[in-house]
Swiss-Prot record:
Keywords: DNA replication, DNA-binding, Endonuclease, Hydrolase, Magnesium, Metal-binding, Nuclease, Plasmid, RNA-binding. Its cofactor is Mn(2+). Residues 1-99 are annotated as: N-terminal domain. Mn(2+) 3 binds at residue 685. This is Protein argonaute. Can be used to create artificial restriction enzymes using denatured tDNA and providing appropriate guide DNAs. This is particularly useful when cloning a region without any known restriction enzyme sites. Addition of UvrD (TT_C1062) enhances cleavage of supercoiled plasmid DNA in vitro. Addition of engineered thermostable SSB (ET SSB) allows cleavage of linear DNA and GC-rich DNA and enhances use as a artifical restriction enzyme. Can be used for genome editing. Residues 507-671 form the Piwi domain.
Amino acid sequence: MNHLGKTEVFLNRFALRPLNPEELRPWRLEVVLDPPPGREEVYPLLAQVARRAGGVTVRMGDGLASWSPPEVLVLEGTLARMGQTYAYRLYPKGRRPLDPKDPGERSVLSALARRLLQERLRRLEGVWVEGLAVYRREHARGPGWRVLGGAVLDLWVSDSGAFLLEVDPAYRILCEMSLEAWLAQGHPLPKRVRNAYDRRTWELLRLGEEDPKELPLPGGLSLLDYHASKGRLQGREGGRVAWVADPKDPRKPIPHLTGLLVPVLTLEDLHEEEGSLALSLPWEERRRRTREIASWIGRRLGLGTPEAVRAQAYRLSIPKLMGRRAVSKPADALRVGFYRAQETALALLRLDGAQGWPEFLRRALLRAFGASGASLRLHTLHAHPSQGLAFREALRKAKEEGVQAVLVLTPPMAWEDRNRLKALLLREGLPSQILNVPLREEERHRWENALLGLLAKAGLQVVALSGAYPAELAVGFDAGGRESFRFGGAACAVGGDGGHLLWTLPEAQAGERIPQEVVWDLLEETLWAFRRKAGRLPSRVLLLRDGRVPQDEFALALEALAREGIAYDLVSVRKSGGGRVYPVQGRLADGLYVPLEDKTFLLLTVHRDFRGTPRPLKLVHEAGDTPLEALAHQIFHLTRLYPASGFAFPRLPAPLHLADRLVKEVGRLGIRHLKEVDREKLFFV
């Protein structure tokens, strides 16, 4: 048993009425697509067809399910995806009974419930609706903006066949003037904007100096004439040219008009009013509003009287962290010694005009290596990035002399300049840690975090886990990155001590899915890295996927593991969707495990009393036979292994947190700079 005791918590969930007989027997629709799509495109296309068909319709297997009768649906039409146009036709096949006790069939009913919620929210009057969020009361107002209070909602079906509603109070800041009017008041450019005539949002790149009457578009019309032909200028001034981009493809600038755009505001944009807005809610007030909104939704949507859901929760045992001896946090290892250290050479690059290592940094490093029983050589780079090839030569010589990582002391730099410098150093195989000056010895948290990041980039293992866990190898998979390309990244840790094995990246690919073959290629690399260190393959592997697991994404990898005789567990880790937890009595703390239905559980990995209502991770055990509590125990302990944070722990387990950092850093720097970088060095922390 891995828990220290149990308690009871309230969830921000409410039980509503049971499904009626018709809702348990949705219409089934066969889908024919012409031309037939490729394997990777089938499910996204079916989801697109469901939206095009209208009504309360969702994907079910290789067809559709609907709570709307076929006669009100759009049974044929065309749609486009990835540059290809498809014709679709739907054939009604009668009603199909679905059993809410069957996880697969319940997932279809839950998808229908979610679509029903969307459709009914859209029909509400006097409220602002965005997807599954509804805002109904004004909280604050200022010149040209207002803040609405409401909630983000979710609706699904329980295994008993009843609707379950989730409510999370939220705020929405709305701008009530065009971008042109907002800028005329002297405000800076917002980061995002939306169309004044619909809800589509854009990244705002810059203002243009072009004349909108003269700026030609591909169809032959000018920018101004194009919008006039769509009827968008009636009652509106066109304004100036603004260049925007789709958030999914920010490298492709699109011309727009400032009079047809509305700023999407954040608290940062309203920083002068931030103190008076008071948008953070104490947990007692959040829970009160949650109950109030649930009652309102139940009445307005005809879903019955909500009943608050309670759940049993278990406090997991606290991880035991080891440096040279037991520590409570990674920063302690700078004083007692690292878990695993070897002879190391570090270099300093100063861009602030000063010379040499600051004495307190030099002293801290020498003390840490002395406590670790390892030797340390400190170098100084006498070159500047502005020297071009001479700087590259200095880096090459440092690498030949055994330097493993570089600390850069610099005045604050623009992000573009930081990324350019980091990429230049990586090209020579030298990960870098950038630390802004001025820097004072009493700023211990700041410079100790920087030193820990530097040491991780040099390949040292600062801390380890002490204890026994089900999996000997944990691998995190994430798809993310910059612009329209994404990188499926894997970062892994050995279960016995949490030591980093390697990072690995495939070629860039489009979309949020990682192709089956790429998943296996990534996993195979980590298995070989484990074998090189241990002399054998692991007996069990823990596979952690950031977000939902697309259907069949891991099918090839799981088949290969089974052939090799390696046991496995596949867990989907979702940063959102876990809702909130409230104590029935007393207080909550880190390591709270809340088992739910269908191999699903909540895990509160990090909680600070002064930071509002706890937000647990939502985890789904997609495949494998390890008991949920044992999985929760290992995953919770893995959150303590992020080496570059000396005083606080991340919310995600280390393999996923590292994979997330990896794909984001590669998105910023590009993949071409990594050929000389050792796979065991965490250049991205």
